[in-house]
C-alpha cells in the first residue's frame, strides 16, 4: 500500500495506463506527431484522423454528433466559452443569466465578469441537501433571461442536479441551458438526445485522462451560436482557435472510450468503497454527511466532524491525501462557500473533509483511512474544550463568549 493514500479523485485522477500508452504514440518522430490542420501531407492527415476518432469517442459517451464537440484547454475554458459566448451572442434578446451559489468558480467568476459588463445575474440558493429547487428556478426566470447555467454534479458534495427537469423548463421558456459536467461525465449517464441541454462542459483529467484538455458540447439542433473567446486560425469551426494538441486529444478520447466501457463497473466499485467508508465512521458522535445521500455520485463523501478544526484534521491525516473544499479553493482559509450555501455555520463548514475515490482505490486503503480518521478525530477532540462542554450537555449556541 502506497502512502499517502490518494483520496482526492475529485481534484484530479491519475491517468489510466491505457490512456498514457496511447498518448505516447502521438508525440515523437516514430509516431503520429503532425499538425491536424496540415492538409498537404500524410503527417497532418494522420493526426487529423486521430483527432476525428477522439471526437467520436467523446461524442459517443454523450450520444451526441461528433460535430457538436469543440476541443478546449479544459472545463474552465469550456465554462468561459459557453457562458460568455452565449451571453454575448444573444445579448440583443436579453441580459439576464441564472446560476446557483454552489457552482464551480469557473462559472461563478465568469458570471461576475458578465455583471461587470452590464449583465444581471441571479444566484439561486440551493436547498439544505444541495439540490436546486425547480420552483425557485422558474420564479427567477424573466422575459430577458438568455442563459441558465447549473452544474450536473457538484465537485465538493457530489450531489446530482435534475438536469433533465431543468432542461425541460429552460426549453419551454426558450432559454439556453449550460451544464458543467466535469464531475459527472463517465460517472453518470448523459444522453443529449433525451436531455434538453444546449451546452456541456467536459474535462479529461476528472475521468482518467490528461490535464490541459477538455471539450464543450454545442448543440446543433436547435443550433446554438456562440461568440468565440479565442481568436486566431479559426480552428474548431471558428469556436476556438489554436493548434489542436493531438496527443492530449487522443488521451481524452481514449479516457472517454474506457469510461463508457467501464461506467457500471467503476460505479459499483465506488459505491462499495463509499459504503465501506460511511459504515466505518457513521457511529462516531457529531458526524454529518454534507449533501443529499441518495441524489449523489458514490465517488464522493463530504463529512463534517464537529468540534474539530478542518486544517488540524488535515494535518493529522498526513497519510491520507484528502481536501477541505475543492482544489481550486483549498488554499484559502475561508470556509467552503458551497457548504455555507447549504446553511452550515462557519464552524461546521471549517470542520469538513472531502473524501473522493475512484478506479484505483482499494478496500484495504479505505480500511486504513477509517482507522486514521477515528484516531485523529478522537485525539483532536480530547484537546478541545468545546468538545468537553458539548459532552456535558451545554448548548454552545447559548454560551456568552467574553470579548476582549
Curated annotation (Swiss-Prot):
Superkingdom to which the source organism belongs? Bacteria
Which residues does the Swiss-Prot or TrEMBL record annotate as the active site? 328 (cysteine persulfide intermediate)
Give the EC number. Answer: 2.8.1.7
User: What is its cofactor?
Assistant: pyridoxal 5'-phosphate
Q: Is-annotated flag, keyword Transmembrane?
A: no
The family assignment reads: Belongs to the class-V pyridoxal-phosphate-dependent aminotransferase family. NifS/IscS subfamily.
Q: Which Gene Ontology molecular-function terms are recorded?
A: 2 iron, 2 sulfur cluster binding; cysteine desulfurase activity; metal ion binding; pyridoxal phosphate binding
Gene Ontology biological process terms in this record: [2Fe-2S] cluster assembly
Oligomeric state and interaction partners are given as:
Homodimer. Forms a heterotetramer with IscU, interacts with other sulfur acceptors.
Which residues are recorded with the post-translational modification N6-(pyridoxal phosphate)lysine? 206
Instruction: Please write the reaction equations for the catalytic activity of this protein.
Output: (sulfur carrier)-H + L-cysteine = (sulfur carrier)-SH + L-alanine
Pathway(s) per entry? Cofactor biosynthesis; iron-sulfur cluster biosynthesis
GO CC annotation: L-cysteine desulfurase complex
- Its name, as the record gives it, is Cysteine desulfurase IscS
Cell location: Cytoplasm
The keyword Lyase appears for this protein: no
Amino acid at each position: 500500500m502506497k502512502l499517502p493514500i490518494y483520496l482526492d479523485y475529485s481534484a484530479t485522477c491519475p491517468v489510466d495506463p491505457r490512456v498514457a500508452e496511447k498518448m505516447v504514440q502521438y508525440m515523437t518522430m516514430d509516431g503520429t506527431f503532425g499538425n491536424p490542420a496540415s492538409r498537404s501531407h500524410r503527417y497532418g492527415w494522420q493526426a487529423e484522423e486521430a483527432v476525428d476518432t477522439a471526437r467520436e469517442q467523446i461524442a459517443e459517451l454523450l450520444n451526441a454528433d461528433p460535430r457538436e464537440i469543440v476541443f478546449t484547454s479544459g472545463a474552465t475554458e469550456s465554462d468561459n466559452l459557453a457562458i460568455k459566448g452565449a451571453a454575448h451572442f444573444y445579448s440583443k434578446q436579453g441580459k439576464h443569466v441564472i446560476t446557483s451559489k454552489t457552482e464551480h468558480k469557473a462559472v461563478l467568476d465568469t458570471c461576475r465578469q458578465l455583471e461587470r459588463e452590464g449583465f444581471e445575474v441571479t444566484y439561486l440558493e440551493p436547498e439544505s441537501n444541495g439540490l436546486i429547487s425547480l420552483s425557485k428556478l422558474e420564479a427567477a426566470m424573466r422575459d430577458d433571461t438568455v442563459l441558465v447555467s447549473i452544474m450536473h454534479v457538484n465537485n465538493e458534495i457530489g450531489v446530482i442536479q435534475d438536469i433533465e427537469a431543468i432542461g425541460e423548463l429552460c426549453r419551454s421558456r426558450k432559454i439556453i441551458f449550460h451544464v458543467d459536467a466535469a464531475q459527472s461525465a463517465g460517472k453518470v449517464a448523459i444522453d443529449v438526445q433525451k436531455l434538453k441541454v444546449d451546452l456541456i462542459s467536459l474535462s479529461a483529467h476528472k475521468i482518467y485522462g490528461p490535464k490541459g484538455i477538455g471539450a464543450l458540447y454545442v448543440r446543433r439542433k436547435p443550433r446554438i451560436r456562440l461568440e468565440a473567446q479565442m481568436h486566431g486560425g479559426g480552428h474548431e469551426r471558428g469556436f476556438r482557435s489554436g493548434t489542436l494538441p493531438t496527443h492530449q486529444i487522443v488521451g481524452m478520447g481514449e479516457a472517454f472510450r474506457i469510461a463508457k466501457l467501464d461506467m457500471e463497473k467503476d460505479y459499483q466499485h465506488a459505491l462499495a468503497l463509499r459504503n465501506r467508508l460511511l459504515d466505518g465512521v457513521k457511529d462516531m458522535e457529531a458526524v454529518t454527511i454534507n449533501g443529499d445521500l441518495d441524489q449523489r455520485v458514490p465517488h464522493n463523501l463530504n463529512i463534517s466532524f464537529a468540534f474539530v478544526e478542518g486544517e488540524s484534521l488535515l494535518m493529522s491525516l498526513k497519510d491520507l491525501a484528502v481536501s477541505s473544499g475543492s482544489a481550486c479553493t483549498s488554499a484559502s482559509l475561508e470556509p467552503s462557500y458551497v457548504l455555507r450555501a447549504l446553511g452550515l455555520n462557519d464552524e461546521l463548514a471549517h470542520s469538513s473533509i472531502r473524501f473522493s475515490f475512484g478506479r484505483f482505490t482499494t478496500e484495504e486503503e479505505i480500511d486504513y483511512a477509517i482507522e486514521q480518521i477515528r484516531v485523529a478525530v478522537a485525539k483532536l477532540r480530547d484537546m478541545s474544550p468545546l468538545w468537553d462542554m458539548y459532552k456535558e450537555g451545554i448548548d454552545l449556541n447559548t454560551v456568552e463568549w467574553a470579548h476582549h
